[in-house]
From Swiss-Prot:
Belongs to the TRAFAC class translation factor GTPase superfamily. Classic translation factor GTPase family. CysN/NodQ subfamily. It comes from Methylorubrum populi (strain ATCC BAA-705 / NCIMB 13946 / BJ001). The gene is cysN. The lineage of its organism: Bacteria, Pseudomonadati, Pseudomonadota, Alphaproteobacteria, Hyphomicrobiales. One of its GO terms (biological process) is sulfate assimilation. This is Sulfate adenylyltransferase subunit 1. Residues 22-237 form the tr-type G domain.
Length: 470
């Protein structure tokens, strides 16, 4: 069977026409160092025929220089792109790869396993729908396996594929497989996963990755790829209320005025009643404008321009939401932080908080507790160090519109930015929202916003991806 193909034989136009309307699933691979995360992704790319001839030639050359599989091709090198990663044989940065099957398109994030790169792992998990947690069958559950399972839970990923790798090195022992699964289920019981699917596999040999293996006669489940093709994630996302942070006001002439942005959640159609935060003004959607023409309905992930039936004052930083479930306005946030800066975080610290498309001034009012990344237990704390996870209260200089993270991952998350370096210092998840009692603080003018925002903005997702080089 031909695994790779030439660009000419591939057919780009046909590929784009076929795959542009497919459902996209984002997932991450995580686990301890050397559990085989990069090899697994390489195997997925290889066996789904996503590799071109020139890539195969380069892979063979790189395998001779940097490979860890002896004379065999090292599939991990398809993902480990940094020179330091190849020289050390580990993953440091978060590597994103795309592949597609007849059923779905996939965006996979290969996250680092070393503890000092946990902040990078949180970057990859922040946008994922499913987590593939790898476990080396020889070693079982490790400290970093538990840490990553906890991080996955804290970041709101509810479905886990427990990929028990290197089963060929333990003779495909069912007893070993059952022991690892039992241990993980016991640890994960309080983490509120809706599903844990355990799959025995060998990423190096390809058993139970894309195609079913024959060695584990006792396993009657599906391969990993089939699980990823069938897991019903998007149906859960569609239940979220409509939210669209305004990126800019589109006014090419005096006859047209619309609000442009990326729909963060839910869907919208002409005639829907909406509320604009923080002003609280209400209106209805008159048009959904795009470069390809008007739409009858737009959904999560689409970039559109909404034209409202009424003249509503709004600018960058505002959020348009369904009137049936408006956002809460607040100037005080209880957040769970993934602290990434080398300097400690203590009460009184002043940072920028970027929420959606709006940047506000934030002061740490209190550090309440630190979360043990291995047990999930909380303990009292008065500061957070690098890689710590903890609960803090932030005081903001104006009211913003947010949701709790458990209700909406987009409008319930933020990043904290160091004022001096403009580096991303933390990823924050809004825990509880208490409505402000004072009058709404007017949104800053465009010139004020430009003066206050750090030079390196680019949106929440771009900021998250900058999380210490992520």
């Amino acid at each position: 069977m031909t695994i790779h193909q030439s660009p000419e034989a591939f057919g780009y136009d046909a590929f784009l026409r076929t795959h542009q309307s497919k459902e996209v699933l984002r997932f991450i691979t995580c686990g301890s160092v050397d559990d085989g995360k990069s090899t697994l992704i390489g195997r997925l790319l290889h066996d789904t025929k996503q590799i071109f001839d020139d890539q195969v030639t380069a892979l063979q050359r790189d395998s001779r220089k940097h490979g860890t599989q002896g004379a065999e091709v090292d599939l991990a090198l398809l993902v480990d792109g940094l020179q330091a990663e190849r020289e050390q044989g580990i993953t440091i940065d978060v590597a994103y790869r795309f592949f597609s099957t007849d059923r779905r398109s996939f965006i996979v994030a290969d996250t680092p396993g070393h503890e000092q790169y946990t902040r990078n792992m949180a970057t990859g998990a922040s946008t994922a729908d499913v987590a593939v947690i790898l476990v080396d069958a020889r070693h079982g559950l490790t400290r970093q396996t538990r840490r990553h399972a906890l991080l996955v839970s804290l970041l709101g990923i509810h479905r886990v594929a427990l990929a028990i790798n290197k089963m060929d090195l333990v003779g495909w022992s069912q007893d070993k497989f059952d022991a690892i699964l039992s241990g993980f289920q016991a640890f994960a019981a309080p983490l509120n996963f809706s599903e844990v699917r355990a799959i025995p596999l060998s990423a190096k040999n390809g058993d139970n990755v894309v195609l079913p293996g024959t060695a584990a006669t006792w396993y009657d489940g599906v391969p990993l790829l089939r699980y990823l093709e069938e897991v019903p994630v998007k149906s859960e996302e569609r239940a979220a209320a409509f939210r669209m942070p305004v990126q800019w006001v589109n006014r090419p002439n005096s006859d047209f005025r619309g609000f442009s942005g990326l729909i963060a959640s839910g869907s919208v159609a002409p005639g829907d009643a909406v509320t604009v935060a923080p002003s609280g003004k209400t209106s209805t959607v008159a048009r959904i404008f795009t470069a390809d023409g008007d739409l009858e309905r737009a959904s999560e992930g689409q970039s559109v321009t909404l034209v409202l039936a009424d003249e509503v004052d709004a600018s960058r930083g505002a959020v348009i939401a369904t009137s049936d479930a408006p956002l809460t306005l607040t100037d005080s946030l209880d957040v769970r932080l993934f602290w990434a800066a080398e300097t400690d975080l203590a009460p009184g610290a002043s940072l920028w908080a970027k929420v959606g498309t709006q940047t506000v001034n934030a002061v740490v009012k209190a550090v309440h507790r630190r979360i043990d990344p291995e047990t999930g237990q909380a303990g009292p704390a008065d500061k957070l160090a690098v890689n710590d996870i903890g609960d803090v209260t932030l005081t903001l200089d104006r009211q913003i519109a947010v949701d709790p993270y458990v209700e909406n991952r987009d409008t319930g998350s933020l990043i904290l930015i160091d004022r001096e370096t403009t580096d991303t210092a933390a990823l924050g998840l809004v825990q509880t929202v208490v409505a402000a009692t004072k009058a709404v603080t007017p949104a800053p003018t465009a010139s004020e916003s430009k003066a206050q925002e750090p030079a390196r903005s680019g949106g929440l997702l771009a900021g998250i991806k900058r999380l210490f080089g992520g």
